[in-house]
Curated annotation (Swiss-Prot):
Cofactor: Mg(2+); Mn(2+)
Alphabetical list of PANTHER family matching this protein: MALIC ENZYME-RELATED, NAD-DEPENDENT MALIC ENZYME, MITOCHONDRIAL
Signal peptide: none
Lineage summary: Bacteria, Pseudomonadati, Pseudomonadota, Gammaproteobacteria, Enterobacterales
NCBIfam families listed in its UniProt record: PRK13529.1
SUPFAM superfamilies for the chain: Aminoacid dehydrogenase-like, N-terminal domain, NAD(P)-binding Rossmann-fold domains
A Gene Ontology term for the protein's cellular component: cytosol
InterPro entries for the chain: Aminoacid_DH-like_N_sf, Malic_enzyme_CS, Malic_N_dom, Malic_N_dom_sf, Malic_NAD-bd, Malic_OxRdtase, NAD(P)-bd_dom_sf, NAD_malic_enz_proteobac
Protein name: NAD-dependent malic enzyme
Organism: Yersinia pestis
Cofactor comment text: Divalent metal cations. Prefers magnesium or manganese.
Length: 565
């Protein structure tokens, strides 16, 4: 039976007694009214007092504060989510900036590493390779019937932690929590999925409590055939769903995106979401400095799918500001573990080969080795923007940052690797090394830096600024695809919300507590772009705005009426 969750009208429920209390989407706990307790056989199953959701949230927050470490806080919040989802999101709404780092990065990394140890209750779908002949049946088994947003991972590249097997399920769960908390997408319409294709992590394979398929990862044609079976089954079950690929390994992420982006409504957050939020931040930073992105020279540490995805978005924006493609690409320098990507490097991936520098253009550089290091690039290319997506901590050294500052009065430094333990440099060090001149944005949350009696806000360049608004915009507009134009629109909407760009002071990105308003603004731009590009029905701006508000779920209890099957 399908329940209609969006309306403000009473909800007709076929469940009663203990079964109703076990249904997280419907459970109100002590907030069931006396009338509801009569009709749903709940008397005796709950304490006498009838509470409001505000009273429940106050108790939950007090309990939350009793936990002293972040891992325990994460487990506690997940337990509330698996007991009473409306209360969970009401609690998040009241304490979003405090709790977002607990339910997602950086704490979710630990939760993924210890997924099998802290496992308490099933959430989402575990699609395992040994059961590949039953994928359609598994999708039918989902407790949610009208799924509109899926986040799927195969657990191979979880944050900067590598292969976590089914432990990677923590990421789709956390990501979808933010779709709801930040983008207002009803939890009744979200589904986390992990594709269990084995693991090459010996710690997981040798862990007696590991709950996944104990087998080396499948790969090649076998792997792609399995993913395709899943995608085709999703299309049969929920043909209009928005599917987000999450934390797939570099070797698979881009091929999967390229294969399916024109087949169903999908995107890859690591490639496209990261690019969109980074681009939005850079546009805002450029405007705050009185310039355009076309004026910047950008160096990347990390030339994987995420780094190259960001670079391509930057190039597209530079071209929209008047540069030719050749001119724009000449301003991008990609560095990986083998050094600067040039046309002489062998074995480059397809998406890397478009971002190489021509060796003939570097003959005037002062070099001492064949491999061109990050420091060589900073000394010779003199970048104004430095972006880290390497997953390797500490590589933005004092020497490197001081060298950058020697030729750039206001350097933009963005160590984006997650979790915090993998960050390329700590904001406090960057501020100190540049005498307070650097504009810093990070992937994980950091507190403001105090330097010479001045407080420097550190922007968290987190995808959560982008993907909830994209999801809301897709659902509100009915978009059938996620296009590059929709992603560009999201970046520009984010840039326009920057306090620094708008007022010349303050943080580069809005406060997390304002993210719901930001998501609605992004949703409007995304929906308009979808209409312009022909992947959504054209409506008036007023109609789209009403659709966004209609689709925006609020964590409030609805009244229930009893019905029968």
């Amino acid at each position: 039976m399908e329940l209609e969750y969006e309306s403000k009208r009473p909800l007709y429920i076929p469940y009663a007694g203990p079964i109703l209390l076990e249904f997280p989407l419907l459970n109100k706990g002590s907030a069931f009214t006396n009338d509801e307790r009569n009709h749903f056989n709940l008397h005796g199953l709950l304490p006498e007092a009838v509470e409001t959701i505000e009273e429940q949230a106050e108790r939950a927050y007090r309990q939350y504060q009793d936990f002293k470490n972040d891992d325990d806080k994460h487990i506690y919040l997940r337990n509330i989510q698996d007991t009473n989802e409306t209360l969970f999101y009401r609690l998040l709404e009241a304490h979003l900036s405090e709790m977002m780092p607990i339910i997602y990065t950086p704490t979710v990394g630990e939760a993924c590493e210890h997924f099998s140890d802290i496992y308490r209750r099933a959430r989402g779908l575990f699609i395992s390779y040994p059961n590949r002949e039953h994928i359609d049946d598994m999708l039918q088994n989902a407790t949610k019937q009208n799924v509109k947003v899926i986040v799927v991972t195969d657990g191979e590249r979880i944050l900067g932690l590598g292969d976590q097997g089914i432990g990677g399920m923590g990421i789709p769960i956390g990501k979808l929590s933010l779709y709801t908390a930040c983008g207002g997408i009803s939890p009744a319409y979200t589904l986390p999925v992990v594709l269990d294709v084995g693991t090459n992590n010996p710690q997981r394979l040798n862990d007696p409590l590991y709950m996944g398929w104990r087998h080396p990862r499948i790969s090649g044609d076998e792997y792609y055939a399995f993913v395709d079976e899943f995608i085709q089954a999703v299309k049969r079950r929920w043909p209009n769903v928005l599917l987000q690929f999450e934390d797939f390994a570099q070797k698979n992420a881009t091929p999967l995106l390229n294969r399916y982006r024109d087949e169903l409504c999908c995107f890859n957050d690591d490639i496209q979401g990261t690019a969109a939020v980074t681009l939005g931040s850079l546009i805002a930073a450029s405007h705050a400095a009185g310039s355009q992105l076309r004026d910047q020279t950008v160096t990347f540490l990390g030339a994987g799918s995420a780094g190259c995805g960001i670079a391509e978005q930057i190039i597209a924006q530079m071209m929209s500001e008047g540069l030719s493609e050749i001119q724009a690409r000449a301003r991008i320098f990609m560095v990986d573990r083998f050094g600067l990507l040039t046309d002489k490097l062998p074995n480059l991936l397809d998406f890397q080969s478009k971002l190489v520098q021509k060796s003939d253009d570097l003959h005037h550089w002062n070099l001492h080795n064949d491999a061109i290091s990050l420091l060589d690039v900073v000394r010779n290319a003199k970048p104004t923007v430095l972006i880290g997506v390497s997953g390797q901590p500490g590589l933005f050294t004092e020497e490197l940052i001081r060298e950058m500052h020697s030729h750039c009065a206001r350097p933009i430094v963005m160590p984006l690797s997650n979790p915090t333990s993998r960050v390329e440099a700590r904001p406090e060090d960057i501020i100190n090394w540049t005498d307070g001149a650097a504009l810093v944005a990070t992937g994980s949350p950091f507190p403001p830096v105090s330097y010479k009696e001045k407080l420097y806000p550190i922007a968290q360049c987190n995808n959560s600024y982008i993907f909830p608004g994209i999801g809301l915009g897709v659902l509100a507009s009915g978009a059938s695809r996620v296009t590059d134009g929709m992603l560009m629109a999201a970046s520009r909407a984010l840039a326009e919300s920057s306090p620094l760009a708008r007022h010349g002071e303050g943080a580069l990105l809005p406060n997390i507590d304002d993210i719901q308003a930001v998501s609605k603004a992004i949703a409007m731009r995304v929906g308009q772009a979808a209409q312009l590009q022909g992947v959504a029905i054209v409506t008036s701006e007023e109609a789209l705005s009403k659709a966004i508000e209609h689709n925006y779920w609020q964590p409030q209890y609805r009244s229930y009426k009893r019905t029968s099957f």
